[in-house]
Amino acid sequence: MTLHKERRIGRLSVLLLLNEAEESTQVEELERDGWKVCLGKVGSMDAHKVVAAIETASKKSGVIQSEGYRESHALYHATMEALHGVTRGEMLLGSLLRTVGLRFAVLRGNPYESEAEGDWIAVSLYGTIGAPIKGLEHETFGVGINHI
């Protein structure tokens, strides 16, 4: 089980998220290479709303199937891992009087040299976190990767 150097899923999702200037070109290239891609934005004082926004966008864009449990479950774990980075391990937002404004990228595909390894999913989050007062936030980032 060897990672394919050009198919590192976490790296690709982070680069997609941070490269806003050439986003559409990058999405086309990723899709041409067999990746399923979803991009979006979410802002909330509730972590469950962040999770729901990412799941809804992923289903609408075809990154995961609407029916079934396994794909949603994998996305959930990748999203929670990314949120741990954003919130520095404390998954609370509104109850600690903080809010997030995030862009997200979800990428699905096989990052390994062997097709037998199957698909994985990566969620990258970038934006701001802080008190719900304009100007009192700071940058934050998180990434999560899970097998499907």
Curated annotation (Swiss-Prot):
Reported effect, residue 8 to P: Great decrease in binding affinity for mRNA
Domain of life: Bacteria
GO BP annotations, alphabetical order: L-histidine metabolic process; positive regulation of gene expression
Pfam families per the UniProt record, alphabetical: HutP
Record-linked InterPro entries: Regulatory_HutP, Regulatory_HutP_bacillales, Regulatory_HutP_sf
Effect upon mutating residue 18 to A: Great decrease in binding affinity for mRNA
Name of the protein in its database record: Hut operon positive regulatory protein
Upper lineage: Bacteria, Bacillati, Bacillota, Bacilli, Bacillales
Encoding gene, per UniProt annotation: hutP
